[in-house]
């Protein structure tokens, strides 16, 4: 006690500057600052005050006489005054213990109007701060039930802290100081100049608004700090809640943390969170922020997350898009088997492996059977994983007045928009008209160009009627045939076919970088609002906003329903009677958008992409020049040329001429029209034959298709007859040639590449006009052989087909009898002539006949020939010699063209070889000929297929070695299909490069 009494005068005599320099004075200080002992942190930082404190002495403590000249007298005076000082000190201590004031010496506690308040002992400058103090500021809601408005925030400090004694005000104008939070501590700062004796009114703020201008207390200066929220990295849920809490009205029983967006039921839990877990605790010196502020790698195309609480940098736009899904909760990739949703494609593909492990090679969703797990996995990725990563805002335009926005996947509009990427067809009456730029883009992508229709031709694509099941996004044939490189039925002065149904707008898609997958991001763009199925969308679905969309559970239920409906759709007319097809009414296989071919089997799709797709072409063969004969219908002879006499056709004897007469049933079909085989009516054009929705049988390949669209695709891309070039007609008719013609003539001039199945000489030359051949038409039962499914059905209907009609520019049907080359046809091989290479012998041939003859007679790798079997003879009957000779002599059948009479004089084998059978084998009729053929071979030369029912004949594939590929172990029912296989698809061509 005495030491403290003695030290008191010494401390008062020292200047405040000396007090700042000496630490021992702080320990022995007995001034009212010592009463702040409950706050252990306050004395350490309270000591450096503002400059005005240096020349102002605390008035509460009386200053003893100062006489530095006589220290002895001063000590004597102290000894004399000691009892009185002791009494005063004791009184002061008692008053200090009784008084609740524990604040700084610049302030004092006062009573005004019966209320405690704090006033300034001396003038306080703006920017003066006190702190730090242990506590926090809690946001409180304004209760509407309270009559008196209270503060929106609450000060939470220790009960003994003097900050609780400061009267609080709500407005900044009424306050001259503020309490704010900084670095997990509370600070009190003077915001306005307070005169001596003035009262302090404090306002609670969550963060400082202005920078203090006090030059001494720079450590407490919050001016250079950014708002707390910008340095906090919150979770997406916290960020959203924190943005709401900034302006939210909070109940009294809820204690939220505005920085983190977390609500607490107890104030103690909130305090613990604020002290130890709050995100605002992260400051520059903390280890968490140190890890945040470490230098990050920079990328040339770096993207930054727009969320202010996240600010994650992504190396690319795609990675930013994937990252943004973590904020929005978007899961655009859906497994259609179990309806699981994923944020990234990789996760969805990884999930699909679960189904490959459990399905044992069978897709339980669509019944697809695969031999390996990899093929099944590719099938699942291609067909049972919805969506591709990409900006859906680029492929959906809600309208002219609305900007393109990215729709969330849990909305109906987003799901329907995405499903358009996989929908097969868009009806013409609902689909928007794509812009010309988009059309040109689609045309180049599909590997063909389109020209406008000629002479009133149908500008739209004739497609199957709506009663036929729509399984694939195939563009109908007439639209394809209108391109410059298409051998379609588009010819000058062509009228629309009466059988053409309503046009259908076909969705155009681009090929994806992933084989068999859906289009890549941004690849599908259309102008206007896309068509959306009516049974899913409302009429005003184009303007449907996202907030009114149904829940995600409804979307998943709709997806499940669509999947089950798709599984229940059979091969019949699922779209009949106006039944909507659905979003997933397309084929269960895969579609090659470059070739516009849809496969029901994923294996066929991959084989097509690897071996036959038009995208495999060499770079020097661009898609736009693949088919140089655009609308060059005049390149063929005019309509009147159908009756010109052809010297090469005028063989000696009436029999061949009668053959020509009866063989001209349909000049367009006979001359290699695309619909040449099986014309429905003699006078119908090729357009009528090909566009007939009921036509599904390819007689050249003996394949019957379930849909007309598949049939047209087959005729365009895969038919054995499509590779035959339209031969040029002779410039002028000549006299009849000699009795014999060369066996192998020069191939015709090629006008495009990749027509190389049957290089028949002058196939399609006009029939002779001179002589009695064109006039009489023998109603022989064999006249209907090439075009009728039943060889025994006799008909005299082909006669009207002799009327002149334009010959279409199309391939030749192999099931018809080829015509010989005119002797004056050009013999020089063009630069792009076909060549055929024998892999085993490394010998190239420019003629298919020479190549087949080599493979038949000379090639050591050729399979051993078995004895040919005649389909019209008993099963044990053997054919001596050539099967073609046997059919012509024994049964009176002309393989490719019907004979005029059973006893017609046959031509020499050398003359028949290039015309009837290039390899000595007779191409069979694609129809079940044995049903109406004679069973007795004894009546040779007089029997025709209409003589009576035959004996049981071998199966169509039982034609011996004629239709059996030993290397591939495949038996064919049609010779033309077998030849096409040997030329294009056989495994022996794996190492060849056939131009």
Swiss-Prot record:
CDD domains: PR-SET_ZFPM1. Zn(2+) 2 binds at residues 592, 595, 608, 613. It is found in: Nucleus. Zn(2+) 3 binds at residues 698, 701, 714, 719. One of its GO terms (cellular component) is cytoplasm. Interacts with the N-terminal zinc-finger of GATA1, GATA2 and GATA3. Interacts with corepressor CTBP2; this interaction is however not essential for corepressor activity in erythropoiesis. Interacts with TACC3. Residues 343-354 are annotated as: Interaction with TACC3. Zn(2+) 4 binds at residues 838, 841, 854, 859. Transcription regulator that plays an essential role in erythroid and megakaryocytic cell differentiation. Essential cofactor that acts via the formation of a heterodimer with transcription factors of the GATA family GATA1, GATA2 and GATA3. Such heterodimer can both activate or repress transcriptional activity, depending on the cell and promoter context. The heterodimer formed with GATA proteins is essential to activate expression of genes such as NFE2, ITGA2B, alpha- and beta-globin, while it represses expression of KLF1. May be involved in regulation of some genes in gonads. Zn(2+) 5 binds at residues 965, 968, 981, 986. Residues 811-817 are annotated as: Interaction with CTBP2. PANTHER family: FRIEND OF GATA2-RELATED, ZINC FINGER PROTEIN ZFPM1. GO terms for biological process: atrial septum morphogenesis; atrioventricular valve morphogenesis; cardiac muscle tissue morphogenesis; definitive erythrocyte differentiation; embryonic hemopoiesis; erythrocyte differentiation; granulocyte differentiation; heart development. Changing residue 352 to A: No effect on interaction with TACC3. Residues 15-36, 908-922 have a biased composition (Basic and acidic residues). It comes from Mus musculus. The keyword Nucleus applies. This is Zinc finger protein ZFPM1. Residues 1-14 have a biased composition (Basic residues). SMART domains: ZnF_C2H2. Residues 67-78, 86-95 have a biased composition (Acidic residues). The modification Phosphoserine is found at residues 99, 143, 286, 397, 497, 500, 651, 684, 803, 822, 925, 927.
């Amino acid at each position: 006690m005495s030491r403290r009494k003695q030290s008191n005068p010494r401390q008062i005599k020292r200047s405040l500057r000396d007090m700042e320099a000496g630490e021992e004075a702080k320990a022995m200080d007995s001034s009212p600052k010592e009463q702040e002992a409950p706050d252990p942190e306050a004395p350490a930082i309270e000591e450096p005050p503002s400059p005005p404190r240096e020349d102002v002495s605390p008035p509460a403590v009386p200053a003893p006489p100062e006489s530095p000249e006589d220290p002895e007298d001063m000590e004597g005076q102290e000894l004399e005054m000691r009892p009185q000082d002791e009494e005063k000190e004791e009184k002061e201590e008692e008053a200090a213990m009784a008084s609740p004031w524990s604040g700084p010496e610049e302030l004092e506690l006062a009573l005004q109007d019966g209320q405690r308040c704090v006033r300034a002992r001396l003038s306080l400058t703006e920017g003066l701060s006190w702190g730090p103090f242990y506590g926090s500021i809690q946001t409180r809601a304004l209760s509407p039930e309270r009559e008196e408005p209270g503060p929106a925030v609450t000060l939470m400090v220790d009960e003994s802290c003097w900050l609780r004694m400061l009267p609080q005000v709500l407005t900044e104008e009424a306050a001259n100081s503020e309490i704010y939070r900084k670095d997990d501590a509370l600070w009190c700062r003077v915001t306005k100049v307070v005169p001596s004796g003035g009262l302090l009114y404090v306002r609670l703020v969550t963060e400082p608004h202005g920078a203090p201008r006090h030059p001494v207390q720079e450590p407490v200066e919050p001016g250079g700090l950014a708002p707390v929220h910008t340095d906090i990295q919150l979770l997406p849920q916290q960020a959203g809640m924190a943005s709401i809490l900034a302006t939210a009205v909070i109940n009294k029983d809820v204690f939220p943390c505005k920085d983190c967006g977390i609500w607490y039921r107890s104030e103690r839990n909130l305090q613990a969170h604020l002290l130890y877990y709050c995100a605002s605790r992260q400051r520059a010196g903390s280890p968490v922020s140190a890890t945040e502020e470490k230098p990050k790698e920079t990328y040339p195309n770096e993207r930054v997350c727009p969320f202010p609480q996240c600010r994650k940098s992504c190396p690319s736009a795609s990675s930013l898009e994937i990252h943004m899904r973590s904020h929005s909760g978007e899961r655009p990739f859906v497994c259609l088997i179990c309806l699981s949703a994923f944020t990234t494609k990789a996760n969805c593909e990884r999930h699909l492996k679960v189904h490959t492990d459990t399905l044992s090679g069978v897709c339980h969703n669509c019944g697809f059977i695969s031999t390996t797990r990899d093929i099944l996995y590719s099938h699942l990725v291609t067909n049972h994983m919805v969506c591709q990563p990409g900006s859906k805002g680029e492929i959906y335009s809600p309208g002219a007045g609305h900007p393109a926005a990215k729709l969330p996947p849990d909305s109906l509009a987003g799901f329907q928009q995405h499903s358009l990427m996989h929908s097969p067809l868009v009806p013409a009456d609902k689909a928007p008209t794509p812009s010309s730029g988009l059309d040109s883009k689609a045309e180049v992508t599909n590997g063909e160009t389109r020209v406008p229709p000629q002479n009133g031709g149908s500008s739209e694509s004739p497609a199957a009627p709506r009663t036929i099941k729509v399984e694939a996004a195939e563009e109908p044939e007439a639209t394809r045939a209108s391109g410059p490189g298409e051998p379609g039925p588009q010819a000058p002065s062509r009228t629309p076919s009466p059988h053409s149904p309503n046009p259908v707008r076909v969705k155009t898609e681009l090929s994806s970088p992933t084989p068999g997958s859906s289009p890549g991001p941004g690849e599908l763009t259309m102008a206007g609002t896309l068509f959306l199925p009516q049974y899913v969308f409302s009429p005003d679905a184009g303007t449907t906003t996202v907030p009114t969309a149904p829940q995600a559970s409804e979307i998943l239920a709709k997806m499940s329903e669509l999947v089950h409906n798709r599984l229940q759709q059979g091969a019949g007319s699922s779209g009949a009677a106006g039944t909507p097809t659905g979003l997933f009414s397309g084929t269960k296989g895969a579609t090659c958008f470059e070739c516009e071919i849809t496969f029901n089997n994923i294996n066929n799709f991959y084989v097509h992409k690897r071996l036959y797709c038009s995208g495999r072409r060499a770079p020097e063969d661009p898609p736009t020049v693949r088919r140089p004969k655009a609308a060059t219908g005049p390149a063929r002879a005019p309509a009147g040329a159908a009756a010109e006499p052809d010297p090469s056709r005028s063989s000696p004897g009436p029999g061949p001429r009668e053959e020509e007469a009866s063989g001209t049933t349909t000049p367009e079909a006979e001359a290699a029209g695309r619909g040449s085989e099986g014309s429905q009516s003699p006078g119908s054009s090729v357009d009528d034959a090909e566009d007939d929705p009921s036509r599904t049988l390819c007689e050249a390949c003996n394949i019957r298709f379930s849909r007309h669209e598949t049939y047209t695709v087959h005729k365009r891309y895969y038919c054995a007859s499509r590779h035959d070039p339209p031969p040029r007609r002779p410039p002028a008719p000549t006299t009849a040639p000699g009795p014999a013609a060369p066996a192998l003539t020069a191939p015709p001039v090629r006008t495009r590449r990749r027509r190389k199945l049957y290089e028949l000489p002058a196939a399609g030359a006009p029939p002779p006009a001179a002589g009695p051949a064109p006039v009489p038409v023998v109603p022989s039962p064999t006249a209907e052989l090439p075009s009728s499914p039943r060889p025994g059905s006799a008909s005299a209907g082909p006669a009207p087909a002799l009327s002149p009609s334009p010959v279409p520019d199309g391939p030749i049907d192999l099931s018809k009898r080829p015509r010989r080359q005119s002797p004056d046809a050009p013999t020089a091989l063009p630069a792009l002539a076909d060549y055929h290479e024998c892999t085993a012998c490394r010998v190239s041939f420019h003629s298919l006949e020479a190549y087949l003859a080599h493979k038949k007679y000379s090639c050591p790798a050729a399979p051993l020939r078995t004895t040919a079997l005649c389909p019209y003879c008993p099963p044990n009957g053997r054919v001596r010699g050539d099967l073609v000779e046997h059919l012509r002599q024994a049964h009176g059948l002309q393989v490719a063209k019907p004979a005029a009479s059973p006893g017609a004089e046959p031509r020499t084998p050398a003359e028949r070889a290039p015309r009837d059978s290039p390899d000595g084998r007779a191409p069979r009729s694609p129809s079940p000929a044995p049903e109406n053929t004679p069973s007795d071979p004894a009546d040779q030369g007089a029997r025709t297929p209409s003589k009576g029912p035959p004996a049981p004949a071998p199966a169509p594939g039982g034609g011996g070695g004629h239709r059996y590929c030993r290397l591939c172990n495949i038996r064919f029912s049609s010779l033309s299909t077998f030849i096409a296989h040997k030329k294009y698809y056989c495994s022996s061509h794996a190492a060849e490069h056939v131009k």
